[in-house]
């Protein structure tokens, strides 16, 4: 009884967030053509099918069963309604799968060849399950679950404070807290593995994110600062000593490659190509 009462409240919240997701998703689809036409012109043979898979397998699944979940409780059996609810959740997760597959491929492209300036698929398995995809998908799914847990816990705590729906709200509050307690250590582990994967495949990006200009051992973690590209330094930087090396290499004196070395490397490679 309590769970049903909680469901009737939270399904309304889900319906609102789903509507916002649809609106923002449609806008994003148009942005691929309006903001990045050059990118789509060259990678459309890969990006287009991945976006199409998301619509055909995920969005249609969500849209088909969302109506039953929202409005069919009194019109279908409890089992059918339960299955519809789980299928909507599965469709949402499947949507994240395809979107993050494309996003990850943009970071760590694989399974393609370039002909006449166009990207063509050689292996869809390699494209979808590219080097950063498992880490990014796990990290994002855990982040979504953690965000939901804190949202649920926060709203329930507010409702309890206002004296609304005591027993049911307390039960859901506990579930939110327990979920967060379970997911937090998993997210820390997933985030660490994702960071190590990024360091392996995109070390220049890591150096840029951390504001590490020169290759160094015992690199500090910059909390705040103002990057100066001409001087190649971060002015007024507030750092935690050795923290960047500890996070990225798991050693206090681990070596982290700096942006200056990448500039020299890429400049040298470009000169060799010319």
Enumerate the predicted regions with their spans.
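Membrane-interface helix-loop-helix modules in multi-pass inner-membrane proteins
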Residues: 17-87, 104
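Conserved small/polar residues in nucleotide/adenosyl-binding loops
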Residues: 266-273
């Amino acid at each position: 009884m309590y769970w049903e009462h909680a469901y009737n409240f939270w399904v309304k919240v889900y319906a609102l967030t789903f509507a916002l997701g649809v609106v923002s998703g449609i806008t994003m689809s148009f942005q691929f053509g309006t903001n990045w036409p050059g990118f789509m012109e060259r990678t459309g043979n890969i990006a287009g099918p991945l976006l199409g898979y998301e619509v055909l397998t995920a969005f249609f699944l969500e849209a088909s069963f969302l109506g039953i979940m929202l409005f069919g409780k009194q019109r279908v059996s409890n089992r059918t309604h339960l299955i519809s609810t789980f299928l909507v959740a599965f469709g949402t997760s499947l949507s994240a799968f395809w979107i993050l597959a494309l996003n990850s491929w943009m970071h760590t492209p694989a399974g393609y060849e370039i002909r006449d300036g166009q990207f063509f698929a050689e292996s869809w398995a390699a494209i979808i399950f590219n080097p950063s995809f498992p880490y990014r998908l796990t990290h994002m799914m855990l982040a979504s679950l953690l965000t939901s847990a804190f949202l649920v816990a926060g709203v329930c705590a507010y409702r309890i404070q206002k004296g609304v729906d005591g027993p049911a709200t307390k039960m859901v509050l506990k579930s939110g807290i327990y979920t967060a307690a379970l997911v937090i250590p998993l997210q820390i582990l997933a985030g660490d593995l994702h960071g190590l994967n990024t360091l392996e495949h995109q070390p220049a990006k890591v150096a840029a994110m951390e504001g590490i200009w020169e290759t160094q051992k015992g690199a500090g973690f910059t909390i705040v600062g103002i990057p100066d590209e001409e001087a190649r330094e971060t002015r007024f930087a507030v750092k935690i000593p050795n923290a960047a090396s500890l996070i990225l290499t798991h050693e206090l004196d681990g070596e982290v490659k700096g942006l200056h070395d990448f500039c020299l490397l890429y400049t040298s490679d470009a000169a060799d190509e010319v």
